[in-house]
């Protein structure tokens, strides 16, 4: 198809490169290889390349500071500990909410009751159905190599949280993206 451009339309001029700092993993029957996607000019075309550049910049700056205290320091490793909070909604209630069905998120609601105290939820025991869900989620996470460490209730009703062991920044971000897809 003529397009009036200087290059063929099938030439995207973007390059994918394997990110060896993040391990490959298998989902169902598919081998997934973490990659970066950059333009032929070097511009980032995804979210991973800017993250790697930011980690590199933090490492360089941290090394500069560390050399004031100990000139023999050769390497800095940045760690990240994220938390993933989520709400659990019964399927029947979910189906009755057009905002959840259409967008996957809450768009309508109302303010909490005045002086509503939710310590009973935050400090309470995890309900058995929720604990079973959490266990299944943790097993799926471990199958992908995500070391989930903690689980607990959060402040709002039906709000819960999981968190993994601290990991190197790049790997922690990859694992967070994977957790959100489970």
State what each model feature region is:
Residues 1-182:
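Glycine-rich, acidic/polar active-site loops that bind/position phosphate-bearing ligands
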């Amino acid at each position: 198809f003529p397009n009036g451009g200087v290059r063929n339309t099938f030439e995207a001029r973007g390059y994918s490169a394997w990110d060896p700092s993040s391990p490959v993993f298998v989902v169902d029957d598919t081998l997934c290889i973490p990659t970066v996607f950059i333009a032929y000019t070097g511009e980032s075309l995804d979210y991973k390349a800017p993250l790697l550049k930011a980690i590199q910049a933090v490492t360089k700056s941290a090394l500069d500071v560390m050399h004031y205290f100990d000139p023999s320091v050769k390497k800095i490793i940045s760690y990240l500990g994220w938390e993933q909070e989520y709400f659990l909604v019964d399927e029947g209630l979910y189906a009755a909410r057009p905002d959840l069905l259409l967008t996957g998120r809450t768009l309508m609601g109302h303010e909490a009751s005045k002086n509503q105290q939710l310590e009973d939820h935050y400090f309470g025991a995890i309900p058995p159905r929720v604990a079973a869900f959490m266990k299944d989620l943790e097993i799926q996470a471990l199958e992908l190599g995500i070391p989930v460490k903690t689980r607990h209730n959060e402040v709002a009703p039906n709000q819960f949280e999981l968190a993994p062991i601290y990991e190197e920044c790049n790997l922690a971000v990859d694992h967070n993206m994977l957790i959100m897809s489970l």
